[in-house]
Amino acid sequence: MCETARTLPPDIVPITVEEARTLIRHTGGPALDALLDRADAVRRAVHGDEVALCGITNAKSGRCPENCGFCSQSAHFPGADAPVYPLVPAEEMVAQAKVAERAGAREFSIVTSGTRVAKESELATIEEAVRKLRAETAVEPCASLGLVREPELVRLKAAGLMHYHHNLETARSFFENVCTTHTYDEQLETIRAAKRQGLKLCSGGILGMGETPEQRVELAATIRELGIDCVPMNFLNPRPGTPMEHVQAITAEECLAAVAVFRLMMPAAHIFVMGGREVNLGGRQHLIFRAGANGTMVGNYLTSAGRGPGETVRMVEEQGLRLRAPDTGREWAFDGSAPAEAEWNRRAAEPGGKRGLPVVGPPRGGCA
């Protein structure tokens, strides 16, 4: 989703956990305005006025043996209505990446459901897709394959993988309320293995699953300690048939305060506001940039609809910000024409549309 974290100017100092615990409760009135303005100033000082977009493909969906309570792809929740299909061919992944690239995505992630990629044939297909992404597109290849083991990371990096994504999802102190089929330490080891292989790291979480504001700060502190380059922030969009179907949504003000605190705690990191922004922020989605975000998604999520590329790009430009275009080596401009939008919608509606074509969102082994 992003490049390596930036180097901080000498006058920008990350806030402490103690200050973060206070600020994250500034969810209204002048206190929230001041918090957003402070985060906006840090974003501009460190990251300028550019906003990056990213895309993913839901390359393998459903029948996941993990029991993440937010995820409609879990086999533990048969009442959830998520698409189920095996790993798509490498050519289909590349075709989706090309659509996302034309929409402005700088990075494209291959996401698979399941604990990890266990079959040699699947790993070989993903390696092939990564090689083709490097050869045929300008997007930077990323993968989100669950609790991947280090030997697989070695192979994927050799194929050209540049980023690895694995969300922690929530604070360690709240994790048992979200998932019991794998441990927090297993997640941390996955991230550390990717770091040992020199891959750029992408890890964040989903807010609004019942955790306290202090636990949101706890998650941010863990991410900061890991030295994550890119932090995707998602807000729960309860999926029918999952244990979290009836969880009360957090307010737009709580979402914005959390984004601002994450920015102030991690001024050098790239912060992307991803899944759930439509549901939780509504008409205030544009404020994610004032809250400190410097990236977002374009298009649909893994198992639910999002905004089209034109709407997202217009939102960026209306805030006086610039899209950080794909590094194609040639002049690039977003094609917001009706034919281009029609092509996007056509791809989303054809058989692959059930596979989230093209999509962006908050993967962790396919959870979204």
Swiss-Prot record:
- Identify the residues that the record assigns to the Radical SAM core domain, covering every copy: 46-277
Q: So where does [4Fe-4S] cluster get bound?
A: 64, 68, 71
Which Gene3D superfamilies does the record match to this protein?
A: Aldolase class I
Q: Which domain of life is it from?
A: Bacteria
Region (Disordered), start-end ranges: 347-368
Q: Name one GO molecular function term.
A: 2 iron, 2 sulfur cluster binding
As cofactor, the record names:
[4Fe-4S] cluster; [2Fe-2S] cluster
Question: Example GO biological process term?
Answer: biotin biosynthetic process
Q: How does it assemble?
A: Homodimer.
Query: What does this protein do, in the record's words?
Result: Catalyzes the conversion of dethiobiotin (DTB) to biotin by the insertion of a sulfur atom into dethiobiotin via a radical-based mechanism.
What protein name is recorded for this chain? Answer: Biotin synthase
Native source species: Anaeromyxobacter sp. (strain Fw109-5)
The major lineage groups are: Bacteria, Pseudomonadati, Myxococcota, Myxococcia, Myxococcales
Gene name on record? bioB
